[in-house]
């Protein structure tokens, strides 16, 4: 059974997934392979609606495997993805307050985040998404004062993963 990591940008989903399994699936990377371009470029060319459609198709295939999946922060924007998450039995919501996440996002030069160009807009998006993350989560972890290793250990303990 898969473990699916959800949460806002900057919560550490990909970092924690790497600690849980040597072979994990970063949904954003799978999507980039499918669309053959960076997500930020796709957003510019085709918009968010087309991106969410492809994201759902790739996600539906990924959850059929017994793997660790790090999702993009907007996975919950598509009602179809909410249904998939609701059916999944091991969904982990990594959360923190907005200021903590914004600081992480601002310091991350490796990832271009199309929806994180403006702090006020990002905060509105954060507030909008929080409820949906909580609704589908089987485990919620506040990552504010925890290292990625501590978070991974908490997940391992919950589902007795080695």
UniProtKB/Swiss-Prot annotation:
Q: What is its EC number?
A: 2.7.1.71
Tell me its cofactors.
Mg(2+)
Q: Which GO terms describe its molecular function?
A: ATP binding; magnesium ion binding; shikimate kinase activity
Keyword rRNA-binding among UniProt keywords: no
Please list the residues that bind ATP.
10-15, 113
Q: Which InterPro entries match?
A: P-loop_NTPase (IPR027417), Shikimate/glucono_kinase (IPR031322), Shikimate_kinase/TSH1 (IPR000623), Shikimate_kinase_CS (IPR023000)
Superkingdom assignment: Bacteria
PROSITE patterns per the UniProt record, alphabetical: SHIKIMATE_KINASE
Q: Does the keyword Transferase apply?
A: yes
Catalysed reaction, written as an equation:
shikimate + ATP = 3-phosphoshikimate + ADP + H(+)
Give the UniProt entry's GO cellular component terms: cytosol
Q: Which UniProt keywords apply?
A: Amino-acid biosynthesis, Aromatic amino acid biosynthesis, ATP-binding, Cytoplasm, Kinase, Magnesium, Metal-binding, Nucleotide-binding, Transferase
- The residues listed in the UniProt record as binding Mg(2+), with positions renumbered to this chain, are 14
The UniProt note on the cofactor reads as follows: Binds 1 Mg(2+) ion per subunit.
> Which GO BP terms, alphabetically?
amino acid biosynthetic process; aromatic amino acid family biosynthetic process; chorismate biosynthetic process
Q: What class of enzyme is it?
A: transferase
Q: Main localization of the protein? A: cytoplasm
The family annotation for this protein states: Belongs to the shikimate kinase family.
Per UniProt, subunit arrangement is: Monomer.
What HAMAP family has UniProt attached to this entry?
Shikimate_kinase
Q: What is this protein called?
A: Shikimate kinase
* Source organism of this protein record: Lactococcus lactis subsp. cremoris (strain MG1363)
Chain's gene name = aroK
């Amino acid at each position: 059974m898969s473990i699916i990591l959800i949460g806002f940008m900057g919560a550490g989903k990909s970092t924690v997934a790497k600690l849980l399994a040597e072979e994990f699936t970063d949904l954003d990377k799978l999507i980039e392979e499918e669309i053959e371009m960076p997500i930020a470029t796709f957003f510019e060319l085709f918009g968010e609606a087309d991106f969410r459609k492809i994201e759902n198709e790739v996600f539906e295939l990924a959850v059929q495997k017994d793997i660790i999946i790090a999702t993009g922060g907007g996975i919950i924007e598509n009602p179809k993805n909410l249904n998939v998450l609701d059916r999944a039995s091991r969904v982990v919501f990594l959360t923190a307050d907005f200021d903590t996440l914004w600081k992480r996002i601002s310091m991350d030069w490796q990832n271009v985040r199309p929806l994180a160009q403006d702090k006020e807009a990002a905060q509105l998006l954060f507030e909008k998404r929080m409820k949906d993350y909580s609704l589908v989560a089987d485990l919620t972890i506040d990552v504010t004062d925890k290292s990625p290793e501590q978070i991974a250990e908490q997940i391992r303990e919950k589902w007795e993963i080695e």
